[in-house]
Amino acid sequence: MTIFNGLSESGESKKLNSKIEKQIENASKKDKKIYKVLLLGASDSGKSTISKQIKILNKNGFSQEEIMTFIPVIRRNLLESAKTLVKIIVQKGINLDPLGTHNCEIIEKFNPTPGELINANIGQAITSLWSANSVRSCTYGNDSVLIDSAPYFFSRADEICSRHYVPTIDDILRSRNSTLGISEISFTLDHLQIRMFDVGGQRTERRKWIYCFENVNSIIFCVSLNDYDKKLYERAAPERNRLVESISLFDSIINSQWFMHSSIILFLNKFDLFRKKLEHVPFQDYFPQYEGKNSVKSITRYILWLFVNPSINRAKHNIYPHITTAVDTSNIKVVFSAVKETILQHSLKEAGMF
């Protein structure tokens, strides 16, 4: 029987520190000819989704056992998002019919303990509530703190809450579980051994470990285009715009002494969500200095310029940008064909053969 298992993202800091330091020490002892890639980006930029896509494209995907481990993660994403949705409805004073009000009550009162079965009633309540146009429209704007995949999970609430639920690949790609510390995936590109490290995106994570990767060959930096109207989740800077935070992080990375010789690959990610949001949320409301056309192409170019202009790229790196939708496997397959060429050329250059 499948269960709803609330996963804790907290832990003992000292144990986590020790574990990560041991990972780094072990990594340095391995073959130095291995090409190392560091996957970076602010929280919720899509880094972990990129890691999953690499596993799908280069590691034969997920085993059945691995697929089943995503059930509690996805159910937690769904339930937490549904509770957040109810809070938004209350805060905005959205008028609901009696059924909508009843559904909100069901969602608010549902607080499963670890080991408790999730039931079909909660799935039906979420599906019914999300079907109301007034509810859907109230989520637009920067005051919405829903995760990007919330609408997708709401549309699949009945399936996710089913006793016999088995996650699809799309479910897995859209699941969100904050990266704590470092995760690693190894794969091969044209006989070149790649080790990719995904470092936690939260401020407290990246500050601790970034200096440990001074010999990294390439950096893939992920940016969520969809974050132009959002504020940070983190307590240290709760009012800071998340796109501005990404620019600041990118600045600190590419101009760091540790990465002067690394190739820089920039993923402008979540393009699908960004394009839809621009129809409802004007970019200039959050970046009034932008004076261009209100078009997806013009605004995308402007955001790219914010990252690659000389005041940011003071180290004068060659930056290789790509527009990505991390949940779209076909898109990532095309993008990684180009990334592969960048990595191979850089490896040849390092070997003095290019």
Curated annotation (Swiss-Prot):
Give residues annotated as binding Mg(2+).
S48, T179
Report keywords, A-Z.
Answer: Cell membrane, GTP-binding, Hydrolase, Magnesium, Membrane, Metal-binding, Nucleotide-binding, Transducer
Organism superkingdom: Eukaryota
Q: How does it sit in the membrane?
A: Peripheral membrane protein
Name the segments for region: G2 motif: 171-179
For the region G3 motif, what residue ranges are annotated? 194-203
Pfam hit, one: G-alpha
| GO MF, any single term | adenylate cyclase activator activity
Effect seen on changing L57P:
Constitutive activity; enhances the GDP-GTP exchange rate
In the record, the effect of V327A is given as:
Constitutive activity
Q: Does the keyword Hydrolase apply?
A: yes
Q: Which GO terms describe its cellular component?
A: cell division site; cytoplasm; cytosol; heterotrimeric G-protein complex; mitotic spindle pole body; nucleus
Cofactors needed by this protein, per the record, are: Mg(2+)
Q: Name the InterPro entries for this protein.
A: Gprotein_alpha_su, GproteinA_insert, P-loop_NTPase
Swapping S81F leads to an effect described as: Constitutive activity
What is one process in the GO biological process aspect for this record? Answer: negative regulation of induction of conjugation with cellular fusion
Region (G4 motif): which ranges?
265-272
Span list, region G1 motif: 36-49
Cite the binding residues for GTP. Answer: D44, S45, G46, K47, S48, T49, D148, L173, T179, G201, N269, K270, D272, A326
Compartment annotation: Cell membrane
Q: What is the effect of changing I56S?
A: Constitutive activity
Q: List the CDD domains hit by this protein, alphabetically.
A: G-alpha
Biological role stated in the UniProt entry: Alpha subunit of the heterotrimeric guanine nucleotide-binding protein (G protein) involved in glucose-induced cAMP signaling. Binds to its cognate transmembrane receptor git3, which senses extracellular glucose, and activates cAMP-PKA signaling to repress sexual development and gluconeogenesis.
Per UniProt, subunit arrangement is:
G proteins are composed of 3 units; alpha, beta and gamma. Binding of the beta-gamma subunit complex (git5-git11) to the alpha subunit (gpa2) facilitates interaction with GPCR git3. Interacts with GPCR git3; the interaction is direct and leads to activation of gpa2 upon glucose stimulation. Interacts with adenylate cyclase cyr1 (via N-terminus); the interaction is direct and serves to activate adenylate cyclase and cAMP-PKA signaling, to repress sexual development and gluconeogenesis.
So what family is this one in? Belongs to the G-alpha family.
Query: What's the name of the protein?
Result: Guanine nucleotide-binding protein alpha-2 subunit
Q: Which organism is it from?
A: Schizosaccharomyces pombe (strain 972 / ATCC 24843) (Fission yeast)
Q: Which gene encodes it?
A: gpa2
